[in-house]
Swiss-Prot record:
Known role: Binds directly to 16S ribosomal RNA.
GO CC annotations on file: cytosol; small ribosomal subunit
Lineage, opening ranks: Bacteria, Bacillati, Actinomycetota, Actinomycetes, Mycobacteriales
Key word Glycosyltransferase present: no
Residue ranges of the region described as Disordered: 1-25
Family annotation (InterPro entries): Ribosomal_bS20, Ribosomal_bS20_sf
Disulphide bond pairs: none
Database matches in Pfam families: Ribosomal_S20p
Biased composition (Basic and acidic residues): 1-16
UniProt name for this protein: Small ribosomal subunit protein bS20
Native source organism of the sequence: Mycobacterium sp. (strain KMS)
Amino acid sequence: MANIKSQEKRIRTNERRRLRNQSVKSSLRTAVRGFREALDAGDKDKAAELLVATSRKLDKAASKGVIHKNQAANKKSALSVALNKL
């Protein structure tokens, strides 16, 4: 346990951020999974719709600092390449 008051606050803050990050990352994984399932099913219209939603979630996560902006860009690029191959 921390002896310093500021460190006690950092522990609380880190826990709140960890829970938020965990939730955001989970929803990202779910969105990407849904997109990939639509690709596997061969449903190009649904996949295109899900790509927009997934890209939005990736951008939001990057702006919140949950993931790095380059990671978001790389994932968006890979997903759009996968859609274009369909």
